[in-house]
């Protein structure tokens, strides 16, 4: 069974999140706070939210530049006026502030040298993210608007009175501290932090490999039962 088969099954059955069967160390909470205290967070996607900020522990710089300085590149290269062919990827200086988070990311199943943006995401008290989805023209054109494997969203610290939910059904993603999900960002979704604390999440892009595919199958069976694996194996691709 491939991750494409799992993605197709989730799309067909309107499954928009899959909890990752893996432990996230609590030290990531303290390191997210340290990144905040050091002043690394920058405003993210003007117009899509209020109090929504980001800082990259792994990102890109213009080719030939020092990758450690790419922490403020929180969008794709074209969002910063660069092309894919004109950038180098690597760990940023935030890795020195969050060494255990970096260590965990290095141990997380991934293809060597294929990570893209790895970002701390902050939603400040009273902050909100407006109704949107993260698909693009290519995904839409290829019928892949819905894509459970498109991104991984980790909740390092999830205050009470704080949600990320589908816009249509108002169903909330069941975040708790130190939990992670494959999240279908092609679904229209919105977020609100009604608490008086910072919400610290982390979004991962890139690195899919066979070991992560195995983790995806394992997580799917834990959430929906082993019978679903047989169902997916028997479906037409």
PLM features: residue spans?
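Catalytic core of Fe(II)/2-oxoglutarate
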Residues: 158-237
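Short glycine-rich, low-complexity/disordered patches
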Residues: 41-53, 111-121, 229-237
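Structured loops at beta-to-helix junctions and adjacent beta-edge loops in soluble globular domains
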Residues: 55-63, 72-75, 123, 157, ...
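Catalytic core of non-heme Fe(II) oxygenases with the double-stranded beta-helix
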Residues: 104-181
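Intrinsic-disorder/low-complexity, polar/charged segments enriched in Ser/Thr/Lys/Arg/Asp/Glu/Gln
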Residues: 15-19, 149-151, 201
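Short, flexible, solvent-exposed loop/turn segments with mixed acidic/basic and small polar residues
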Residues: 5-10, 140-142, 193
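Generic structural motif
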Residues: 23-27, 123-126, 157-159, 207-211
């Amino acid at each position: 069974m491939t991750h494409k088969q799992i993605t197709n099954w989730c799309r067909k059955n309107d499954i928009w999140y899959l909890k990752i069967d893996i432990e996230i160390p609590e030290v990531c909470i303290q390191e997210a706070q340290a990144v905040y205290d050091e002043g690394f967070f920058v405003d993210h996607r003007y117009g899509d939210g209020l109090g929504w900020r980001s800082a990259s522990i792994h990102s890109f710089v213009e080719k030939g530049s020092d990758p450690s300085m790419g922490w403020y590149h929180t969008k794709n290269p074209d969002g910063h006026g660069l092309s894919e062919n004109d950038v180098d990827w690597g760990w940023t200086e935030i890795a020195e502030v969050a060494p255990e988070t970096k260590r965990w990311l290095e141990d997380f199943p991934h293809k060597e040298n294929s990570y893209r943006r790895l970002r701390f995401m902050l939603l400040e008290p009273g902050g909100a993210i407006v109704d949107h989805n993260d698909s693009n023209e290519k995904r839409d054109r290829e019928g892949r608007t819905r894509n459970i494997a498109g991104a991984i969203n980790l909740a390092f610290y999830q205050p009470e009175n704080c949600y990320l939910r589908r816009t249509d059904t108002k169903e909330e993603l069941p975040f708790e501290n130190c939990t992670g999900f494959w999240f279908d960002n092609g679904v229209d979704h919105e977020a609100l932090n009604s608490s008086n604390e910072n919400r610290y999440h982390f979004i991962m892009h890139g690195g899919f490999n066979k070991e992560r595919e195995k983790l995806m199958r394992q997580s799917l069976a834990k959430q929906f039962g082993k019978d679903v694996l047989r169902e997916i194996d028997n479906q037409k691709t």
